[in-house]
C-alpha cells in the first residue's frame, strides 16, 4: 500500500502539486481522472463522494487510502512494486492498466484548487452523502443494494445506508 501511495504522490509532484498536502493532491487526482471533462458540479460531486467515504467507517480514514483501496499484487517486473489488481479497486482509473499521468496540467491545476476548497471548507453536499457512483451507462450489481440520491452529469449517485 505504501508503494501505491508513493506512486500517486509522485504523479502529484510531477503535476506541480509537490508542496501541497498529500490528501488534497490525492483528492485532486481522483477528481481529475474521474470527472475532468465535467462541469464544476460534476467535479464537486466526485470529490464529495470521496470525502463521504473517508467519513464512513466502512472505508479507510484518509483520502489517499480510500482511492488506493483494493487488492494489490507484486509486479511481474520483479521490482518489488505492488500494483493494483485490474478492475478490482474503488475508482476505475486507479486499476484500469492505463497511465495515470496528468496530460492536461492546466485542467489539473484548476481541479487542485477545487480540491483545496473541498478539503478546507464546509459545503452543502450536492450528492446527499452518496458513497458510490457509476457512469449512467453502467449498471453495476451493487446498485440494487444502495439508495439512489441524485444524478449529476453522467454519474448516478447512491448512498450505502446500512452500517
Residue ranges and their predicted role:
Residues 1-11:
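Sec-dependent signal peptide recognition
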Residues 8-10, 18-21:
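Cleavable N-terminal signal peptides
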Residues 21-163:
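Bacterial extracytoplasmic/cell-wall-associated proteins, especially those involved in peptidoglycan
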Amino acid at each position: 500500500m505504501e508503494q501505491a501511495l508513493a506512486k500517486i504522490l509522485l504523479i502529484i509532484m510531477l503535476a506541480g502539486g509537490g508542496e501541497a498536502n498529500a490528501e488534497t493532491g490525492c483528492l485532486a487526482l481522483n477528481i481529475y481522472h474521474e470527472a475532468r471533462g465535467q462541469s464544476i458540479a460534476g467535479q464537486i460531486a466526485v470529490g464529495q463522494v470521496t470525502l463521504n467515504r473517508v467519513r464512513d467507517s466502512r472505508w479507510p480514514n484518509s483520502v489517499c487510502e480510500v482511492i488506493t483501496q483494493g487488492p494489490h499484487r507484486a509486479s511481474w517486473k520483479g521490482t518489488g512494486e505492488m500494483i493494483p489488481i485490474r478492475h478490482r479497486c474503488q475508482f476505475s482509473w486507479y486499476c484500469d492498466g492505463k497511465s495515470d499521468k496528468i496530460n492536461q496540467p492546466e485542467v489539473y491545476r484548476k481541479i487542485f484548487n477545487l480540491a483545496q476548497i473541498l478539503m478546507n471548507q464546509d459545503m452543502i453536499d450536492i450528492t446527499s452523502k452518496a458513497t458510490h457512483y457509476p457512469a449512467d451507462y453502467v449498471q453495476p450489481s451493487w446498485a440494487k443494494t444502495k439508495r439512489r440520491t441524485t444524478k449529476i452529469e453522467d454519474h448516478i449517485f447512491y448512498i450505502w445506508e446500512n452500517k
